[in-house]
Amino acid sequence: MNWCFIVFSSFATANRVKSLLLKNHGIKSTIMQTPGEIKLKSCSYCLKINLLHLDTAWDMVVRSGLSSKGVFSAEGFNKIR
């Protein structure tokens, strides 16, 4: 299964998105500390989601006006959004 990480600066924001994804779209995700392979200037939390749900999840983040540090592939940790 292909995974990706949507990175947020706070646990609260990640948790809000996780709840909205499950409630509004039935999409399950996992909150975790951002892997060290993703080089960011500060610590952060991310949602690990199936890549198949990325468009739905990203649209929800944008429409909600929430701030994200980006989306990274779980394979290679490349920034994809």
Label each PLM-derived region with a short phrase.
Residues 12, 28-51:
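Amphipathic, hydrophobic secondary-structure cores in small proteins
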Residues 50-81:
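C-terminal structural segments of small proteins and small subunits
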Residues 4-5, 30, 69-70:
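Structural motif
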Residues 10-28:
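Short amphipathic alpha-helix segments
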Residues 16, 41, 57-59:
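Short acidic, gly/pro-rich beta-turn/loop elements at beta-sheet edges
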Residues 19-20, 32-37, 72-74, 79:
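Conserved, structured core segments of small domains
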